[in-house]
Amino acid sequence: MGIKGEETYVNDIKRIVTDDKEKFYNYMNLKLTGLICEEPDWLANLSNASALLWLLLDEINWAGFYLYKNGELVLGPFQGKPACTHIAIGNGVCGTAARDLETQVVKDVHLFPGHIACDAASQSEIVVPIVHEGKLMGVLDIDSPIKERFDEADAKGLQKFVDTLNKYMDWSKIV
């Protein structure tokens, strides 16, 4: 990789500055593929995925995963402040996304019935369910201290992020 005599680092990921969300998410998914495509360990992959989100997404205060285990969501790899460790299916934004198997774009978390406040600074949230071969594996959860931070373009881009995870992850090692 790289030019002879130059060192290339796996963590040499540059931030991209663009107003084009499709271009941004395509770039981020390319970087995710590079990080996880040859790594079989699920913990390493989800850890790097959450670190990548933390590095590249602006105006967020939490990014990570909850994994579906024993009928509930259990905290997985993340970046940000310590978080709730268990979430019941149907509770809060994460539990709702898991129950309905639908992405939740919440422009103001204070208006979401039953919102679970792990960080008082959070104002908006997006949660994408991770479904593999028809089964719930968990959710991708991202919080922002900015109201209306997330929109449908983010939902589409983050769904592709989850699709990339599904392409390379061996979920059988987790559940």
Question: Which role does the model predict for each range below?
Answer:
Residues 146-148:
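A generic structural motif
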Residues 124-131:
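A short, aliphatic-rich beta-strand micro-motif
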Residues 2-77, 164-175:
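Intrinsically disordered, low-complexity terminal regulatory regions
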Residues 131-144:
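Sensory-domain boundary capping and coupling elements
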Residues 60, 68-118:
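Regulatory sensory and allosteric helical modules in signal-transduction proteins
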Residues 62, 127, 139:
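Short hydrophobic/aromatic beta-strand element in the GNAT-like acyltransferase core
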Residues 150-168:
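Amphipathic alpha-helical "output/dimerization" segments
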